């Protein structure tokens, strides 16, 4: 891909913070710009937690304790999408051992014991009714009060939470769960999507101007809103803010992520579909 640093005359790179620029930087070259940032986030129906006399969960033990209270009504404290279940298990192993699944170079470095710990953690979540199996995840369960929470990407927040909000439930953003004696956070963030320019383009200036319009342009920002996530570009954010278009559960989740210092940059290899499928099939 084209090094976008070489096209900074046409692209306002100053609209992006260092983390946003790092997503598309490889070996010092800026290959892509993000539209927004994403991470697994826990959304809770505070109305239901209040009814059960429970505080919102801060750690895995809180979720287990909530399950003890809710299971007599066949209610789960939280439901997880497949990706959320997988990344929660990855987070748990890192929190307990301090070891990451991937090295800085992207090499798999879990031991066999780490893999067993990862699978055992998720099995415990299932056995103790903290969450229903990810392969049975139902987006309608939150509004039906069959679950008191959902864990998913920020970009999917409105899809899962808005129906419950329309029923009058107070849906709030929860903490990123941890082990009570965690030695590491274990949670990651990534770009929602990215734009890049082919290295062999015959029209780099025109392509750069188009890219700038897509990520920084006021007109594009207003047309797109938060369709590709809360904008990573400060220019696009300002355009939305000026028109009171920054609101809702997705924006609140994005604000929590932006203000968190515990989230690391996710390697694309952490989302390897083969590893995810193996995790799910083994858990089944």
Q: Which stretches of residues belong to each language-model region?
A:
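Glycine-centered hinge/linker elements that transmit conformational signals in sensory
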Residues: 69, 107-135
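Short glycine- and hydrophobic/aromatic-rich loop-to-beta-strand nucleating segment
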Residues: 40-44, 195-197
């Amino acid at each position: 891909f084209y090094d976008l640093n070489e096209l900074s005359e046409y692209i306002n790179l100053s609209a992006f913070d260092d983390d946003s620029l790092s997503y598309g930087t490889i070996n010092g070259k800026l290959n892509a710009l993000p539209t927004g940032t994403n991470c697994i986030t826990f959304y809770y129906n505070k109305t239901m937690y209040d009814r059960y006399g429970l505080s919102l969960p801060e750690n895995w033990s809180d979720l287990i304790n909530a399950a003890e209270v809710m299971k007599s009504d066949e209610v789960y404290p939280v439901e997880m999408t497949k990706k959320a279940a997988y990344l929660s298990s990855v987070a748990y192993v890192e929190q307990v051992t301090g070891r990451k699944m991937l090295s800085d170079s992207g090499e798999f470095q879990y031991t066999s014991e780490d893999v067993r710990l990862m699978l055992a953690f998720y099995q415990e979540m299932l056995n103790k009714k903290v969450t229903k199996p990810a392969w049975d995840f139902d987006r309608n369960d939150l509004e039906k009060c069959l679950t008191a929470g959902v864990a998913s990407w920020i970009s999917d927040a409105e899809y899962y939470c808005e129906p419950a909000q329309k029923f009058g439930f107070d849906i709030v953003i929860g903490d990123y769960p941890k082990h009570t004696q965690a030695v590491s956070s274990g949670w990651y963030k990534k770009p929602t999507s990215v734009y890049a320019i082919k290295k062999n383009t015959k029209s780099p200036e025109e392509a750069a101007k188009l890219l700038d319009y897509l990520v920084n342009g006021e007109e594009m920002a207003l047309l797109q809103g938060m369709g590709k996530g809360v904008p990573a570009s400060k220019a696009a954010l300002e355009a939305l803010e000026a028109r009171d278009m920054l609101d809702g559960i997705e924006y609140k989740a994005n604000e929590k992520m932006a203000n968190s210092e515990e989230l690391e940059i996710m390697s694309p290899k952490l989302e390897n579909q083969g590893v995810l499928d193996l995790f799910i099939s083994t858990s089944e």
